[in-house]
Swiss-Prot record:
Pfam families: AP2
Any one GO biological process: ethylene-activated signaling pathway
Transmembrane regions: none
Keyword Transcription: yes
Top-level division of the source organism's lineage: Eukaryota
GO cellular component: nucleus
Protein's UniProt keywords contain Aminoacyl-tRNA synthetase: no
Protein name per UniProt: Ethylene-responsive transcription factor ERF035
Function text: Probably acts as a transcriptional activator. Binds to the GCC-box pathogenesis-related promoter element. May be involved in the regulation of gene expression by stress factors and by components of stress signal transduction pathways.
Record-stated family: Belongs to the AP2/ERF transcription factor family. ERF subfamily.
Gene Ontology terms for molecular function: DNA-binding transcription factor activity; transcription cis-regulatory region binding
Primary location recorded for the protein, binned into one broad class: nucleus
InterPro entries: AP2/ERF_dom, AP2/ERF_dom_sf, AP2/ERF_TF_ERF_subfamily, DNA-bd_dom_sf
Organism encoding this protein: Arabidopsis thaliana
Length: 256
């Protein structure tokens, strides 16, 4: 009986030891698992931080350069200079437009070449400057390169118009000259008209005074009342009190 109790107690004690060992094993595995999970989490966070840092650095670089590669016909050299070129129409070759310190200068050079080769249908980096860019003498690559260099090196842009004050002065002088010419024309016309009128008047007077003499002997009618004295009549001047002349009619007794 005593032996049986000892065996049962020892078995129970052995089971307790096994349970303790199993519990300790489970606890240690849980610790290992948790530490492994924490390490994995730390690693993932570190990788994410590195990735986000790289993205931030890339975005900062893009912001600093203001995306210069968006200019058409412009690319950057490894040493920091910017080159400009354009493809010739219906050819695989390109026209070299030069190397410039900034992307904007290279872009203006490209715009000049695009206008020369493609006209108004060409794609421009600065369409607002299309009317101010220099034009090449011809469409040869040499002339295009010269005009492109001139546009790239230009620092200021002015519209090719006359100053407003000068334009007003020119307009005023043109108006004055027009008015003077109109006045001169009117004066010449009036002078010609006056001369024509005086000439017509003189010719009319000559016509009046060139009438045939109605009192000549050949044209006078003997039966006319003015011919009572054989075609003769007399005028008698009276004193100063009389106003004019008096016509002295002949008497019949004078013809006896």
């Amino acid at each position: 009986m005593g032996k049986q109790i000892n065996i049962e107690s020892s078995a129970t004690h052995h089971q307790d030891n096994i349970v303790s060992v199993i519990t300790a094993t489970i606890s240690s595995s849980s610790v290992v698992t948790s530490s492994s999970d924490s390490w994995s989490t730390s690693k993932r966070s570190l990788v994410q931080d590195n990735d986000s840092g790289g993205k931030r650095r890339k975005s900062n670089v893009s912001d600093d350069n203001k995306n210069p590669t968006s200019y058409r016909g412009v690319r950057m050299r490894s040493w920091g200079k910017w080159v400009s070129e354009i493809r010739e129409p219906r050819k695989k070759s390109r026209i070299w437009l030069g190397t410039y310190p900034t992307a904007e200068m290279a872009a203006r050079a490209h715009d000049v070449a695009a206008l020369a080769i493609k006209g108004n249908s060409g794609f421009l980096n600065f369409p607002e400057l299309s009317g101010l860019l220099p034009r090449p003498v011809s469409c040869s690559p040499k002339d295009i390169q010269a005009a492109a260099t001139k546009a790239a090196e230009a620092t200021t842009w002015h519209k090719p118009v006359i100053d407003k004050k000068l334009a007003d002065e020119l307009s005023h002088s043109e108006l004055l000259s027009t008015a003077q010419s109109s006045t001169s024309s009117s004066f010449v016309f009036s002078s010609d008209t006056s001369e024509t009128s005086s000439t017509d008047k003189e010719s009319n007077e000559e016509t009046v005074f060139d009438l045939p003499d109605l009192f000549t002997d050949g044209l006078m009618n003997p039966n006319d009342a003015f011919c009572l004295c054989n075609g003769t009549f007399t005028w008698q001047l009276y004193g100063e009190e009389d106003v004019g002349f008096r016509f002295e009619e002949p008497f019949n007794w004078q013809n006896d």
